[in-house]
Curated annotation (Swiss-Prot):
It comes from Escherichia coli (strain ATCC 8739 / DSM 1576 / NBRC 3972 / NCIMB 8545 / WDCM 00012 / Crooks). It is an enzyme of class 6 (ligase). Pfam families: Pantoate_ligase. It is found in: Cytoplasm. The keyword Aminoacyl-tRNA synthetase does not apply. The reaction proceeds by a bi uni uni bi ping pong mechanism. The gene is panC. Homodimer. Beta-alanine binds at Q61. Catalyzes the condensation of pantoate with beta-alanine in an ATP-dependent reaction via a pantoyl-adenylate intermediate. This is Pantothenate synthetase.
Length: 283
């Protein structure tokens, strides 16, 4: 497994792979890898000849400096996991390599609408940072496919739109959420939970499933469903942050013509902001 930290070396390897006619898959990550990331890697391996995993804690997508400072950097452990998975290439650049003149004056990519709604409304600049780094990685790696987790539902929708709008010839693969046995969605942020909070955390998925059950039996008073769900989260020990029921195909409000809904939930548990989602077919 090659570990590359500089743009010239990465370009050299990508040129070689292209000359050999290899099909390349990219898995962009911020490191601190868990089994959910490994599922992305496995999906990439099944679809391509060569798998490139990027590990870069992107300062442009953090709206709070303290979040950036405390985000775990576990490069050695991450590379050991990826080596066991027989990943071909890890791209682990420094911030200086990606943003030589800092983030403030760096050219950015913005996806109107999707970047400022829902999660974007409560985290200004976050999705602009995501779309900028992902488009830069697409330019550098030139993958045939790229794999992203469905846990970050809005992020996946944003990347699909960016790819369509910018004409990237890249297949975007959404990989289903991986969960612990008790239902908690795997996330790097779960590491912020205390042992006691970890026992409470599966309650998020229980509330999510409860909302889904109501929608599936035909309940359509969305405001009431959301209010009750917020109360349930708070009673379980969470601090409900945002609960949305949206059209899964547009992320706009659910309408009479909506075929599928997505339930998006964000809640604080101690110092961890947990997010999850669930799709529901609307009868």
């Amino acid at each position: 497994m090659l570990i590359i930290e500089t743009l010239p070396l990465l370009r050299q390897q990508i040129r070689r792979l292209r000359m050999e006619g290899k099909r390349v898959a990219l898995v962009p990550t911020m490191g601190n890898l868990h089994d959910g990331h490994m599922k992305l890697v496995d999906e990439a391996k099944a679809r391509a000849d060569v798998v490139v995993v990027s590990i870069f804690v992107n300062p442009m997508q953090f709206d709070r400096p303290e979040d950036l400072a405390r985000y775990p950097r576990t490069l050695q452990e991450d590379c050991e996991k990826l080596n066991k998975r027989k990943v071909d290439l890890v791209f682990a650049p420094s911030v200086k390599e990606i943003y030589p003149n800092g983030t403030e004056t760096h050219t950015y990519v913005d996806v109107p609408g999707l970047s400022t709604m829902l999660e974007g409304a409560s985290r200004p600049g976050h999705f602009r940072g995501v779309s900028t780094i992902v488009s830069k990685l697409f330019n550098l790696v030139q993958p045939d496919i790229a794999c992203f987790g469905e846990k970050d539902f809005q992020q996946l929708a944003l990347i699909r739109k960016m790819v369509a709008d910018m004409g990237f010839d890249i297949e975007i693969v959404g990989v289903p959420i991986m969960r612990a046995k008790d239902g908690l969605a795997l996330s790097s942020r779960n590491g912020y939970l205390t042992a006691e909070q970890r026992k409470i955390a599966p309650g998020l998925y229980k509330v999510l499933s409860s909302i889904a059950d109501k929608l599936q039996v035909g309940e359509r008073d969305l405001d009431e469903i959301i209010t009750i769900a917020g109360q349930e989260l708070n009673e379980k020990g969470f601090r409900a942050d945002d609960i949305q029921i949206r059209d899964a195909d547009t992320l706009l409000e659910v309408s009479e013509t909506s075929k599928r809904a997505v339930i998006l939930v964000a809640a604080w548990l101690g110092d961890a902001r947990l997010i999850d989602n669930k799709m529901v077919e609307l009868a």
